[in-house]
Each structure stands twice: as C-alpha cells, then as structure tokens.
C-alpha cells in the first residue's frame, strides 16, 4: 500500500514539473513577442520617412532663411540623400555612389 502512495506523489511532482516548464516556455515566448513589437515600433519611428517629413515641415516654416536651407542640405548629405531645397518644398532622392580608383573601372 505504501508503494501506491509513493507513485501518486511522484506523478504529482512530475506533472507539476511539466506544468512549470510549459509556463516558463510560454512566458519566454510572450516576452520575446513583446520585445519584437517594441523594436518594430522603434524601427518605424526611425524610418527616414519621418525624418523627411520633419525636414519638409521645417522648410515650410523657415523656408526663407538661407542658413536653414544649407543645414537641411547638410543633414541630407550626412544620411546619403540628395536634397533640393526650393521655396515651397524639399525634394529627396536616395543616391548611392560607388568610387573606383583603379584601372579596373
């Protein structure tokens, strides 16, 4: 009779261990999903589209100042964009320049 009680206790402990493992696994997956969501939202805010919109808004508000226009062109150049600053708009083009300095060009 004592053996039966020991087996029941072992089964309870075994199932409790399995439940703990399942809960830990699910909480880990859930935490990873939350982290991925946060990183995705940060990536959308850091996307150049938002920077371009901000620069266009600055151009609309301070377009008459030539110093602001030169600063906008400098910011565009640092990001690898070609930027044409006009009276009412800022036009962007993404350009990649490859330099070749050898005879293989």
UniProtKB/Swiss-Prot annotation:
It comes from the Archaea. This is Uncharacterized protein AF_0761. Keywords: Membrane, Transmembrane, Transmembrane helix. It is found in: Membrane. Its main location: membrane. It is a single-pass membrane protein. One of its GO terms (cellular component) is membrane. The chain crosses the membrane at residues 13-35.
């Amino acid at each position: 009779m004592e053996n039966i009680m020991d087996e029941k206790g072992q089964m309870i402990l075994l199932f409790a261990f399995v439940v703990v493992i399942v809960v830990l696994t699910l909480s880990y997956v859930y935490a990873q999903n939350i982290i991925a969501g946060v990183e995705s939202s940060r990536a959308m805010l850091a996307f150049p589209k938002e920077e371009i919109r901000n620069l266009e808004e600055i151009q609309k508000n301070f377009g008459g100042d030539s110093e602001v226009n030169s600063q906008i062109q400098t910011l565009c150049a640092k990001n690898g964009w070609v930027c044409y600053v006009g009276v009412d708009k800022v036009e962007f083009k993404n350009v990649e320049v490859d330099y070749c300095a050898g005879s293989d060009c």
